[in-house]
Amino acid sequence: MKIVEKPWGRELWVAVTDQYALKIIEFKKGSRSSLQYHKVKHEHIYVDSGVAEMEWENDQGQMEKLLLKPGDVVENKPGRKHRTTAIEDVRFIEVSTPHLDDVVRVEDDYHRK
């Protein structure tokens, strides 16, 4: 398993194949990810523990705020903007296509490109 440290927490890459990827994503309370989208990557996120707010682009192209709790699932389709803010320490389980470098950051608190 590969561990990838992030400014907001870390990712544990459990499986990466030519068909899919499985990651455990951990956010520290009060941190947030970049506002981002993916050109090709398609992901489903399951909230394993904690509470988070997700800014999420809906089917009409409008940004919504979703309150995510354990047991919730969110689908992030290619081209859809999204950002996670951890209200508590949060753990997601993410299943996606294997395009792990496919990240376009629109806004980023940590000045990453």
Description of each model-found segment:
Residues 2-5, 62, 85-113:
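Double-stranded beta-helix
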Residues 23, 35, 47-48, 55, ...:
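Beta-strand residues in well-ordered beta-sheet regions across diverse protein folds
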Residues 32-34, 53, 72-83:
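Histidine-centered metal-chelating micro-motifs
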